[in-house]
From Swiss-Prot:
SUPFAM superfamilies reported in the protein's UniProt record: Annexin (SSF47874)
Location within or outside the cell: Zymogen granule membrane
This protein's name: Annexin A4
Modified sites of kind N6-acetyllysine: 213, 293, 300
Domain notes per entry: A pair of annexin repeats may form one binding site for calcium and phospholipid.
Other remarks in the entry: Seems to bind one calcium ion with high affinity.
Length: 319
C-alpha cells in the first residue's frame, strides 16, 4: 500500500524550553489562551510533545498534563490531553476507559485490537499491566462474553504471524474451511473464522479472501454479515477491513462517528489523535472517495469552538 502518511510532522527549529514557556504563559493567571495552546501542541509531533512536557517540568516545576487538565474542559481537553499522551499509553488508557464502569465501549476495543500491529499489541499488553497492575486479557474476560470475548482475547495476545510468507495449499485450505464453516452448512463454526482471521499474516489473508470469493461467489464480508451477529460480527468485519485497507477502515470509523444526529466524540477524537502522524492523508483520500465530501468539511460541520480548531489542524487541510 503506497501511503501518503500523516499530517502532523516534526516541527523544524523546535525549542522545547520556548514552547514550555509559551504554554505556561497561556495558562497563567485568569483565563486561558487556547489559541496559543493549539499553536504549540497541534504543530509538534508526539516525540516533541514529550520533550516539551519534560522541559515544562524542569523549568516550571509543574506537570504539563495536570495543568492542561485543570485549565481545559470537555472535548477540547480530551483532544489536547490525548495528543500529550505517548502513543502506546494512549491506547492503553482508551482500552481501560472502554471497560471501566457500567457498560462497555465495544467499538473502542474492536478498533484498537483489530488495527494495531502484533508488536504494538504486545507493547499495549505490557503497558496495561504496568499501569493498572492487572492484565488486559483478564479485564477483557471479565467485561465481555462468548465468541466476542474469544476474538478479543485472541487479538490481545498479539500472536498474529507477522511475516509475508504464502503457502498456496494453506490458502486454499483456509478458504475451503471458512466456506465449510459458514455458507456451506446449517449453523456456523465460529471458531474456524476466529482461528484463520486472528492468526494468519496479512498477505496470506488477502489471498484467502480472493480464494474464498472464487469458491463461494461471495465476499468474505457478506458471509460474515449473514453468518454471525452482534459484536462478534463487528470484530470480524473490522479485522477483514483492516487487512484489506487500514486507512479506509479509519475513514469509515470517522464517517460513522459524525453522520446523522449527534457525534460519537470518543471515536472522532481517538482516530484523529492516533492517526494524525501515521496515515491521516490516506484516511482523507479514502474519506473523499467513499463519501464524496472531505473529512475537513465533515469535522467543520459537526464540531465547534476550540475543539473544532484543533481537529481541523490534525486533519491538515481540505480536499
Amino acid at each position: 500500500m503506497a501511503t501518503k502518511g500523516g499530517t502532523v510532522k516534526a516541527a523544524s527549529g523546535f525549542n522545547a524550553m520556548e514552547d514550555a514557556q509559551t504554554l505556561r504563559k497561556a495558562m497563567k493567571g485568569l483565563g486561558t489562551d487556547e489559541d496559543a495552546i493549539i499553536s504549540v501542541l497541534a504543530y509538534r509531533n508526539t516525540a516533541q510533545r514529550q520533550e516539551i512536557r519534560t522541559a515544562y517540568k524542569s523549568t516550571i516545576g509543574r506537570d504539563l498534563i495536570d495543568d492542561l487538565k485543570s485549565e481545559l474542559s470537555g472535548n477540547f481537553e480530551q483532544v489536547i490531553v490525548g495528543m500529550m499522551t505517548p502513543t502506546v499509553l494512549y491506547d492503553v488508557q482508551e482500552l481501560r476507559r472502554a471497560m471501566k464502569g457500567a457498560g462497555t465501549d465495544e467499538g473502542c476495543l474492536i478498533e484498537i485490537l483489530a488495527s494495531r500491529t502484533p508488536e504494538e499489541i504486545r507493547r499495549i499488553s505490557q503497558t496495561y499491566q504496568q499501569q493498572y497492575g492487572r492484565s488486559l486479557e483478564d479485564d477483557i474476560r471479565s467485561d465481555t462474553s462468548f465468541m466476542f470475548q474469544r476474538v478479543l482475547v485472541s487479538l490481545s495476545a498479539g500472536g498474529r504471524d507477522e511475516g509475508n510468507y504464502l503457502d498456496d495449499a494453506l490458502v486454499r485450505q483456509d478458504a475451503q474451511d471458512l466456506y465449510e464453516a459458514g455458507e456451506k452448512k446449517w449453523g456456523t463454526d465460529e471458531v474456524k473464522f476466529l482461528t484463520v482471521l486472528c492468526s494468519r499474516n496479512r498477505n496470506h489473508l488477502l489471498h484467502v479472501f480472493d480464494e474464498y470469493k472464487r469458491i463461494s461467489q461471495k465476499d468474505i464480508e457478506q458471509s460474515i454479515k449473514s453468518e454471525t451477529s452482534g459484536s462478534f460480527e463487528d470484530a470480524l468485519l473490522a479485522i477483514v477491513k483492516c487487512m484489506r485497507n487500514k486507512s479506509a477502515y479509519f475513514a469509515e470509523k470517522l464517517y460513522k462517528s459524525m453522520k446523522g444526529l449527534g457525534t460519537d466524540d470518543n471515536t472522532l477524537i481517538r482516530v484523529m489523535v492516533s492517526r494524525a502522524e501515521i496515515d491521516m492523508l490516506d484516511i482523507r483520500a479514502h474519506f473523499k472517495r467513499l463519501y464524496g465530501k472531505s473529512l475537513y468539511s465533515f469535522i467543520k460541520g459537526d464540531t465547534s469552538g476550540d475543539y473544532r480548531k484543533v481537529l481541523l489542524v490534525l486533519c491538515g487541510g481540505d480536499d
